[in-house]
Amino acid sequence: MTEHRLHPFAALRVLRKTLVLYLVPLLRVLFERNWAALRAALRQDLILFLLVCALSWVILHASSWSLDESGTFCLHWKLLFRFDRTVRGASLAALTIERPFYYRLAGASRVTLYPVGEPKQRTLTLCLRRADAQHLADQLLPIEAPSLHRPKGGERAALGLLGANSLSTLALFLLAIRQTQQGPDRYELAFAQINFLAGLAARWLPAGAAWLLAFSGFLLGLSLLRSFVQTVHYEVWHTSTQIGSRGGWLDRFECRVKSDQISFADVRLSPFARLMRRWPVFVTAGSCSPELPLFVYRSGEEALFRELLPEFRMPPDLLARTEQRSLIFFAPAGIPFALCLLLTLVSATVLPQLTVTLLIPTLFFGALLAGAAAGYRREGLWLREGRMTLRRQQGLYLHCICVLHPDVCLTATQSPWAASVGRTNLTLTFPGWVKLKVRSVPLRDAEKFFKFMETN
């Protein structure tokens, strides 16, 4: 059994954690403009950096990994004492391979192993060479006769939103420049192309609020650009025992999940998804909850969905029972919304130039409050065709979830008020200590879940 070394990028974690140690004193001296002290701090930081590099070198040469013929992975540590951690391929729930752009330049890959039932703190993350990472994944979770699919829903949705955001952000930047530099200038030709609504906004929007909106739109555009780059060359595959996906342009990502270890599948409905009529589907296996969806399907084209996850059942399109329901749904967004609204109303008479600026957080929390109202009417539990299904609201996202794993722990908690009106909070705990909480549901609905767990 041959032992292999980790990639040198494995030391980046140590360097990143110690970065603050020699940057904070340097910044303090720099602001004081004491150049003699600055040179002394630079010398100290250089010595500290060399010590950290030496420590990283020791860590790299004291650690190694090996893989035997039976598919058992072992991570070794040999410095002062010997420590080995062993993971069998049969005990894995999922495996991910990440190759950020700077990793690709150095030929490195970040591999994360998710053992069955282990929490996220017990996952194993390695930095390996690209060929070693691919070989390790093929040995632990081999792909045999996969069926490939290349859904275009996510790529088109991200591209459409990115285009709309780019146009709106450009208009906001032009408005901000116009508010900052009043009078005819070289931007007049550009503003001639802005429609009546943009001109109206330019008249009433202060410069500070315009720049704030433009910066917010720019950050949203970066997020959408990242989403689009991640969905390029995206493909989904499945075998008799596994399901997975891979893709990306600058940053590459691959996920392999055992089908029998999927805890639940989650269809997330957001305002953008409703607008584009494309629904992202996420899966969770053990403590593995990938940031990217497994696939995105379009309304009316559910064939791929049924092929990849035939056991999935969508929660029924029903309104939840709201009689005697707790108003805790509205607290997280309602309190800051009321505060911002009060400040906006006060500024209208005391400081009118801040009114429009204060409207921005007011509208933001107002949108969250609208999401809370949707959760108040839609969140609930249902048994459908032998599957536990639930719907829960988080911010602007409505999660439609189907439980697929038999090992689920149900916990019902009641306050005295909830007990008096027959309501309870139900928490579902899955392998890997992943928890889902459904708030203020009827006690009789929760009891149906308990009886279902006892008989199945």
Task: Name each model feature, range by range.
Residues 1-456:
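N-terminal basic, Ser/Thr-rich segments that initiate or prime the first beta/alpha elements at protein or domain
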